[in-house]
Amino acid sequence: MKRALIVMPLLLSLYAGAQELYVSTEPASNMPAHSLGIRMTSRFFKMEHEGITGIRFEPEIMWGVSKKLMIHVAGLASNQMQSSIEPEGASIYAKYRFLSKDDLHSHFRMAAYIKGAVINNPFYPQMIDNSRKPYKNAELDLEGGASGVAGGVVATQLIHKLAISGTLGYNRFMNNTKNRLPDEMSANAVNYSLSAGYLLLPRTYRSYEQTNLNLYVELLGKANTDAVSRNHYLDIAPAIQFIFNSATRIDLAYRTELFGNMPRNVFNTFTVRFEHNIFNVVKRKG
């Protein structure tokens, strides 16, 4: 009984903001304090240069340090830049919620985040034969593209079953462990996003064991700011999400470009994610 009284508020808080669990971005809200999350993300994408499907696996561990601070640690493995699926490096992400205004059926939150990555990929894919298209890519990221750091702010508004969130961030790309950042690639970029999530089911909440069905649409933009490669793009990423027992979720998302002038090796990505959360890992004393 005591355990139920402790865990139930955590599950209720997760349910109340279930439509904030965006697939392509992070909300300003955090996971419950002292909770542990295990996540596996698989991405499938057509590589324009090779004309074949690339795959990236991202195992991730998440920890709710407190109600205001959470940390993610992720590994990366892919065949995007290597001849086969190889480890690419790792990243660490931290988010601190500095503003929270809660009402009965709504809340507004703001948070700051920082991310760092160490990547061992080359900046140009390994050549196996000469039958491929010329490699044209001006997009870098911290998910296998380049080592570097990023930081920014997130604001999220929840109103009943609808959650709207916006992100503005700065990225500084650096040399990879074995390769120098090419002079023709921008070392600086700005990222921005606008995300909406809607809780479709259940229509009436009766138990934390009910399955949640959430629908999302996210606009994801990036602009390189260095004069050597000043270009931009805006993508759209619709997604569907299932949450079971308020602790386990499955995400399905598709991302494609709306418009832009940035040369890219990948324009379309299909994402499958599995996540499981364990609440109250560290029990309170007394």
Question: What name fits each language-model region?
Answer:
Residues 91-94, 194, 266-286:
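Outer-membrane beta-barrel "beta-signal"
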Residues 18-61, 119-123, 133:
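Short glycine/proline- and aromatic-enriched beta-strand/turn motifs that initiate or cap beta-hairpins
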